[in-house]
Amino acid sequence: MKYLLIALVRGYQYAISPFLGRSCRYVPTCSEYMVDAVQKHGAFRGGWLGVKRVCRCHPWHPGGYDPVP
């Protein structure tokens, strides 16, 4: 499950993200954060942390440096 999630995010990074341009307000980007969170915490908790991060990534949030806990 862990490797499937990472593969899906990597697929997004290489196939879709280049056409959308840089729009993430955070460092590391939301997709990098998702991969790091899944590697560090596993599929379920890491996936949940990644989803929460994507929900916080919008124009009205200041963004900035936000590492995986």
Swiss-Prot record:
InterPro entries: Membr_insert_effic_factor_YidD. Pfam families: YidD (PF01809). It is a peripheral membrane protein. Keywords: Cell inner membrane, Cell membrane, Membrane. Its main location: membrane. GO terms for cellular component: plasma membrane. The keyword Ubl conjugation does not apply. It comes from the Bacteria. It is found in: Cell inner membrane. PANTHER family: MEMBRANE PROTEIN INSERTION EFFICIENCY FACTOR-RELATED (PTHR33383:SF1). Belongs to the UPF0161 family. Could be involved in insertion of integral membrane proteins into the membrane. This is Putative membrane protein insertion efficiency factor. It comes from Dechloromonas aromatica (strain RCB).
